[in-house]
Design a protein with these regions (language model features):
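N-terminal glycine-/serine-/threonine-rich beta1-alpha1-beta2 phosphate-ribose binding loop
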Residues: 1-138, 153-165, 476
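Alpha-helical packing segments of well-folded alpha/beta enzyme cores
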Residues: 13, 52, 85, 128, ...
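Structural recognition of the beta-strand scaffold that forms the well-ordered cores
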Residues: 40-43, 64-68, 117-118, 140-141, ...
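Short, solvent-exposed loop/turn and secondary-structure capping segments
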Residues: 51-56, 76-78, 126-131, 151-152, ...
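Short, solvent-exposed turn/loop segments enriched in Gly/Ser/Thr/Pro and often Arg
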Residues: 99, 119-125, 145-147, 152, ...
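Residue-level signal for alpha-helix termini/capping positions
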Residues: 107-110, 133-134, 160, 186, ...
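A contiguous active-site-proximal alpha/beta segment in oxidoreductase catalytic domains
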Residues: 138-140, 146-226
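Contiguous beta-strand/loop segments that form the cofactor/metal-binding neighborhood of enzyme cores
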Residues: 180, 192, 197-199, 206-423, ...
């Protein structure tokens, strides 16, 4: 019998051990299969990809390959900051193999790669992550976890089936104050929860356009076919990539998809809800091509152990109140700085600037922002006088760093990253139901979670599970 283990099987052994009784009986590092430097493939090398790779290497990974649709080595002078970031990544990892197609890289490198970071536009998250997980590779994927609702369900399912270690890129999830607030809310510091309110001033990119911009010549350094990938074709224009794809239904998920995995995180995590019962959207400016200029979304959830007896709602607000799409300059023009936010009755004079959350319970409120001074504030009634402050129940991430937590999960020193796909998948699914509701404003949609259908609206199924371009199989 051959007892020799490959580096891939070492990592799989580590994950399997920690996922079971190893939690109670620590296993020596050598038995867990600790790797000196786990190897990583960076999918999406510029912009957020630069930060993800920096976080991964700081945690202890070795970058051996990069996949990006922009080959900066084919460019002359570089002025755009996102293109500059790609050049900086290539310079930082000069020995890393580079290709535009991550599928080819994964196939060619095989077991030489232990893990991947996925830092692409939203419409590539599913294919890159699923292929990696099915190949036994650990995955760190940027938010939102997926572009589509069915995709989010599948990501959580495949992560569980393969047993690889996963983490979604909502970095504040690793902050101590975030985890302490989850513990306090669950312990009842504000009583049973009735409402959650979250908001952002985004979009800060173009949304609300009625047709694509004119086609322009594709720069020689860009593999535009690979950028489009599984999504519907549109001719290249710099108004689409590298940044403004967020404002396209086919490639991004608007301000809601871009920011809710950050800002809704505290409320959703604290409540540990099942699927929402209903969702309804109010919005302004959505078109066939683009999400709205501003919106308000409300999800209704059934009662659980942390909620009031009637259940609870999550309420989302985005966008500037007085804004319009400027086609000539391909941007949003706003008048004034007022953006959608909760009522004064909710805020009670608290100003958390461009984003924030308020959790409303039967005995008080918790005001929260993701970082900075006074990151959370309690406003309670006399109920808090007899409140028993809970012991810590959630693990704390080393250095409050979600890259480090993911690395530690792979190495077997912690059981998992706390933003694992088993949590991130259902949260993303909930958020993307809100994105779907933006397409049919004013209509309360009833969600049948077991069948993944909107009750009475079969025609909306195409937005729940999208079709892919030839060559991009949904089964990978």
């Amino acid at each position: 019998m051959n007892r020799q283990l490959t580096r891939r099987s070492f990592v799989k052994v580590a994950g399997a051990a920690v996922g079971s009784s190893a939690l109670l009986h620590p296993v020596p590092l050598i038995a867990r299969g600790r790797l000196e430097k786990p190897t990583i493939l960076g999918i999406g090398a510029g912009g957020k990809g630069k930060a993800d790779l920096a976080g991964a290497t700081k945690a202890g990974f070795e970058v051996i390959a990069l996949a990006d649709v922009v080959d900066v080595k084919k460019l002359g002078s570089i002025t755009d900051k996102r293109t500059k970031s790609m050049a900086q990544v290539r310079d930082a990892y000069p020995q890393a193999r580079f290709e535009s197609d991550y599928r080819e890289l994964m196939a060619d490198l095989g077991d030489k790669v232990d893990a991947v970071t996925v830092s692409t536009p939203d419409h590539h998250h599913f294919h890159a992550s699923i292929k990696a997980m099915k190949s036994g590779k650990h995955v760190y994927c940027q938010k939102p976890l997926t572009h589509g609702i069915w995709e989010a369900r599948m990501m959580a399912k495949i992560a569980e089936e393969t047993g690889v270690k996963t983490q979604m890129g909502n970095q504040a999830h690793a902050n101590d104050h975030m985890r302490r607030c989850v513990e306090l809310i669950r312990a009842g510091v504000i009583g049973k929860v009735k409402e959650i309110h979250t908001w952002t001033n985004r979009p800060i990119w173009a949304q609300g356009f009625a047709s694509p911009p004119p086609a322009t010549k594709v720069p020689k350094a860009i593999d535009w076919k690979q950028w489009i990938g599984p999504a519907p074709w549109v001719d290249y224009n710099p108004a689409i990539a590298p940044f403004a794809w967020r404002g396209w239904w086919n490639y991004g998920t608007g301000a809601l998809g871009d920011m809710a995995c950050h800002i809704m995180d505290l409320g959703y995590w604290s409540m540990n809800p099942g699927p929402p019962e209903t969702v309804v959207a109010e919005q302004s400016g959505a078109t066939e091509f683009s999400p709205p200029i501003n919106s308000k979304i409300t999800w209704e959830f059934s009662p659980n152990e942390y909620s009031s007896k009637d259940g609870f709602t999550i309420n989302w607000y985005d966008g500037y109140v007085n804004a319009s799409f400027n086609r000539e300059d391909w941007k949003l023009d706003k008048v004034g700085n007022e953006y959608n936010h909760p009522s004064e009755e909710v805020l009670e004079g608290m100003d958390f600037e461009k984003f924030g959350s308020v959790i409303i319970g039967e005995h008080g409120k918790l005001f929260f922002k993701r970082s900075g001074k006074n990151a959370w504030v309690l406003k309670t009634d006399t109920h808090v006088d007899g409140f028993q402050w809970p012991e810590k129940s959630l693990p704390r991430a080393a250095g409050e760093d979600n890259y480090q937590e993911w690395y530690d999960a792979i190495q077997g020193t912690v059981s998992r990253g706390e933003s694992h796909f088993g949590l991130a998948g259902p949260m993303t699914e909930t958020i993307l139901l809100g994105v779907l509701a933006q397409r049919v404003p004013g209509e309360t949609l009833k969600w049948n979670a077991s069948k993944m259908k909107i009750v009475g609206r079969p025609e909306l199924g195409k937005f729940i599970r999208r079709e892919y371009s030839p060559g991009w199989d949904s089964t990978i």
